[in-house]
């Protein structure tokens, strides 16, 4: 007796342990979603599945039970009354298993579609073929088609159940065939018809009806057809395929009646004829469609397909939100006057002279401070710095967890990043280095931007958990040879109660969490610190931008991220990158210290986000609740902009004839990614940093030019603003035909503006401008000299900005010594307008040489990239001598007198050494 009780207790404990191990993930999810304030979002899915599971289970169970009930007489006659009761138990158990599995599979795969169906929001637009609101295709049709597939699967399951029972009883007959009281199911007088003829007749009829209905539903999929010259239903789809689908549906209805009657009457010929008729129709449809396409449509394709091409143009433009672009014609004037520059001096003052690649490389060398920090990316934003609207690069300093070797360092000690580096986009120092306005640890801040808490517990590279408020404290930042510590006082993380220590030890498969003496009951474990993973855990149904960026807000750091609603079910809209409808409907804000996540709706007219608002109550906030200073940092997302640019290469036209003839197709402008050195004296490679490894190179080492965030001013506008610009060429040619800009400041946010250039003129595109740089004898000599002396030459971003009715071209050149720890420095600026091109040390000198425009004298607040003459505090005569030698060396270089150039450079080195020793 005691052993029995002991065994029961041990088994119970074992079961509890197993349940605990299995449910650890669920328990942690509940705690984590409660911490971030979205527990209702977590339970939305679970509640939906549970609500669906019960009725679906009842439906499955009842259908199968009723069907088995109709077979009871046949089964009873075969097994006898005595064994029938035991057989019923097996059938009941089998029904339970099948119903549970079927209901579970249906509920877990269809819950989201059902919620979308029941919370559908109309688009207010209809497709041109069936006159259905777009919401029918996006929210309703997927569920209806899935339910029909499920119903067909259920019919097949019932047929299989019938066959299995029939065969099982047949196997039993072979075992007991010597017993006279058992009916032989395999006898000629007793077959499957007598066993389940009526049931199979009903199933066959229902299956035929379902197939017919599925063809009616299939006709709606023609709005996604790729058969014609444009996406969506074409002439053949509407005039041939759609009619065939209707005929097949009618034939299936007739066949269902024929099959039912014929099975009951044992007449198989009508069944064969009806099934064969449907098969012939199914086979005949593509044959007739191909014939019609080749011999009717092809000879008259333009006329017959024209209305359907128009449908595709209209739908694609609406779906990708490019139907309201403000298009302006521009015929660039090749002569920018100094008066025009003076009128647009705010454009000149904000010209982008820094590029992300070299800048990030410099940050990594100078601003890491310690090797356990890293800069993942440098993002572009704008701030009012000391009263001036300024575009800046911002890069947060995060912990490099790859450099951590011990568990304590990785999870207890080095828990957070610290501060950021911020530098101006439009200026460099006298040495060509970034012009910092925030830098170092502790933060050296030369702006009026308030940053009181620079700590980063949540970032782009934080993929591991950390435990804060431990006995030893957390490393905060270095001061000389000492380390400052910090104890986390935020709201993020889960309390490390004894229960949670056991729970996370099991979850992380690491007993150190349980055994460490540094962890107390006041300690907290912070999970999902990677901001992308964090928001995906909360709202996986949104698509997130690939480039989150950090913002200084209210004395602390927060991340901003763009989120998209999208679908591939928009009728007649041609898909790009897996979607054919997209909206930037949500801005996500993540607190870098506490981990709080807020989702703000920015597009209240988007039906998909309005559907989500009904499904996930409490998840989204109206834009009116966002702090106003955060709205000032809205960026038009680059991922969306580049997707829209790709769509525009084909769908910038309104005329269906132009789309059909492909006479006006565009390409996004190309840029040289690597240049192998035919202009270089020693074959040294000139590297390109403007592509950032995102675009795929072609065989000529060319890739699509990326859109760039620039501070500029559009023609006819009064103020500079941050914009995203992209450039287009005529397909197969390199001459630029259009410039696209996305506005993002204030009330102009989201507006797209396009300037079209006359196609008969040659307008320099980025790649033509780059080729021109490399072919210019003066520029190529200078670059060849640097490369020949062992320096690495790096081209910056190519900038093309409109100045009233003209275009100004800008490129910068960086030099980097061929050593492991060298830093790129911006040494030259190339400016061009029309046929003129110059290379100089800075913007001011280039403007003076190209346009005779002296911005330094006429503009008191000129760009900082002009070399200051007051920052060298040594002997003034020495400085003047050095400047004279440098100017003479450059003059000799321009004249091709390399011997004289070398002499002046040697003398310059001696003078600089002398100054440095004084």
Swiss-Prot record:
Biased amino acid composition, Basic and acidic residues: 857-876
Region Disordered: start-end pairs: 856-876
Tree of life domain: Bacteria
Segment forming the signal sequence: none
Transmembrane segments: 8-28, 46-66, 91-111, 151-171, 200-220, 243-263, 271-291
Principal location: membrane
Membrane topology label: Multi-pass membrane protein
GO CC annotations on file: extracellular region; plasma membrane
Keyword Transmembrane: yes
Keywords assigned: Cell membrane, Membrane, Transmembrane, Transmembrane helix
Compartments (UniProt record): Cell membrane
Family that this chain belongs to: Belongs to the UPF0182 family.
NCBIfam families (alphabetical): PRK00068.1
Protein name: UPF0182 protein CPE0011
């Amino acid at each position: 007796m005691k052993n029995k009780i002991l065994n029961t207790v041990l088994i119970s404990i074992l079961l509890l342990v197993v349940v605990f191990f299995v449910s650890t993930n669920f328990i942690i999810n509940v705690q984590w979603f409660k911490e971030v304030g979205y527990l209702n979002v977590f339970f939305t899915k679970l509640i939906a599945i549970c609500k669906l599971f019960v009725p679906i289970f009842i439906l499955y169970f009842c259908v199968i039970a009723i069907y088995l009930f109709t077979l009871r007489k046949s089964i009873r006659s075969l097994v006898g009354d005595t064994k029938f009761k035991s057989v019923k138990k097996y059938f009941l158990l089998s029904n339970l298993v099948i119903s549970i599995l079927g209901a579970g599979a249906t509920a877990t795969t269809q819950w989201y579609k059902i919620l979308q169906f029941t919370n559908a929001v109309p688009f207010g637009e209809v497709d041109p073929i069936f006159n259905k609101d777009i919401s029918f295709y996006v929210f309703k049709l997927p569920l209806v088609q899935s339910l029909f597939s499920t119903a067909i699967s259920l019919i097949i399951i019932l047929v299989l159940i019938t066959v299995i029972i029939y065969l099982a009883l047949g196997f039993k007959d072979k075992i007991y065939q010597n017993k006279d009281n058992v009916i032989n199911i395999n006898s000629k007088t007793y077959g499957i018809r007598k066993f389940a003829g009526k049931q199979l007749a009903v199933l066959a009829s229902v299956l035929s009806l379902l197939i017919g209905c599925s063809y009616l539903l299939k006709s709606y999929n023609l709005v996604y057809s790729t058969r014609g010259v444009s996406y969506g239903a074409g002439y053949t789809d509407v005039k041939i395929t759609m009619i065939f689908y209707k005929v097949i549906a009618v034939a299936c209805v007739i066949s269902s009646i024929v099959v039912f009657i014929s099975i009951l009457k044992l007449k198989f010929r009508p069944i064969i004829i009806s099934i064969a008729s449907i098969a012939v129709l199914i086979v005949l449809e593509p044959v007739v469609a191909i014939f019609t396409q080749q011999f009717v449509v092809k000879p008259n394709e333009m006329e017959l397909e024209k209305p359907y091409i128009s449908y595709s143009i209209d739908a694609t433009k609406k779906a990708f939100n490019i139907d309201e672009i403000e298009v302006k014609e521009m015929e660039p004037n090749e002569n920018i006057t100094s008066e025009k520059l003076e009128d647009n001096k705010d454009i000149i003052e904000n010209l982008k002279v820094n590029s992300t690649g070299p800048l990030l490389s410099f940050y990594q060398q100078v601003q890491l401070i310690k090797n356990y920090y890293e800069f993942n990316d440098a993002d572009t934003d704008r701030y009012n710095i000391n009263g001036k609207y300024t575009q800046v690069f911002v890069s947060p300093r995060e912990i490099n967890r790859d450099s951590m070797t011990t568990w304590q360092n990785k999870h207890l000690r080095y828990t957070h990043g610290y501060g950021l580096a911020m530098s101006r986009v439009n200026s460099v120092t006298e040495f060509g280095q970034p012009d910092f306005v925030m830098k170092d640890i502790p933060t050296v801040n030369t702006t009026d931007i308030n940053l009181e808490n620079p700590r980063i517990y949540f970032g782009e590279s934080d993929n591991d958990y950390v435990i804060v408020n431990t006995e030893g404290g957390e490393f905060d930042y270095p001061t000389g040879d000492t380390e400052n510590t910090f104890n986390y006082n935020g709201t993020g993380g889960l309390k490390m109660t004894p229960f949670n220590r056991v729970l996370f030890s099991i979850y992380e498969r690491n007993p150190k969490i349980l055994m460490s003496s540094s962890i107390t009951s006041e300690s907290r474990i912070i999970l999902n610190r990677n901001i992308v993973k964090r928001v995906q855990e909360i709202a996986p149904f949104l698509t997130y931008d690939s480039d989150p960026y950090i913002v200084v807000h209210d004395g602390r750091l927060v991340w901003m991220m763009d989120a998209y609603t999208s679908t591939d079910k928009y009728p007649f809209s041609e898909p790009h990158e897996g979607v054919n409808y997209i909206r930037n409907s949500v801005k996500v804000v993540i607190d870098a210290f506490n981990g709080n996540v807020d989702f703000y709706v920015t597009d209240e007219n988007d039906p998909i986000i309005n559907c989500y608002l009904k499904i996930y109550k409490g998840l989204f906030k109206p834009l009116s609740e966002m702090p106003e200073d955060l709205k000032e940092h809205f960026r038009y997302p680059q991922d969306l902009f580049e997707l829209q640019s790709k769509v525009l290469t084909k769908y910038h036209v309104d005329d269906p004839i132009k789309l059909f003839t492909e006479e006006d197709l565009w390409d996004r402008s190309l840029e040289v990614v690597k240049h192998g050195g035919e202009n270089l004296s020693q074959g040294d490679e000139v590297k390109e940093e403007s592509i950032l490894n995102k675009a795929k190179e072609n065989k000529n080492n060319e890739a699509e030019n990326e859109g760039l965030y620039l501070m500029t001013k559009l023609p006819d506008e009064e103020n500079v603003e941050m914009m995203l610009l992209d450039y287009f060429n005529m397909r197969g040619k390199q001459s630029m035909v259009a410039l696209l800009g996305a506005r993002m400041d204030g009330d102009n946010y989201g507006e797209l503006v396009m300037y079209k250039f006359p196609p008969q003129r040659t307008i320099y595109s980025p790649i033509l401008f780059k080729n021109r740089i490399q072919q210019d004898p003066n520029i190529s000599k200078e670059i060849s000299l640097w490369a020949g002396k062992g320096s690495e030459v790096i081209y910056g971003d190519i900038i093309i900005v409109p100045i009233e009715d003209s275009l100004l071209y800008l490129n910068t050149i960086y030099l980097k010594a061929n050593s492991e720890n060298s830093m790129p420095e911006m040494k030259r600026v190339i400016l061009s307008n029309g046929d003129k091109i110059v290379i100089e040390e800075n913007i001011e000198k280039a403007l003076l040489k190209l346009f005779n425009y002296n911005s330094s004298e006429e503009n008191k607040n000129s760009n900082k990239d002009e070399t200051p003459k007051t920052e060298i505090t040594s002997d003034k005569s020495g400085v003047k001598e050095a400047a004279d030698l440098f100017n003479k060396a450059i003059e000799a270089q321009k004249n091709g007198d390399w011997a004289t150039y070398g002499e002046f450079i040697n003398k310059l080195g001696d003078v600089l050494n002398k100054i440095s020793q004084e």
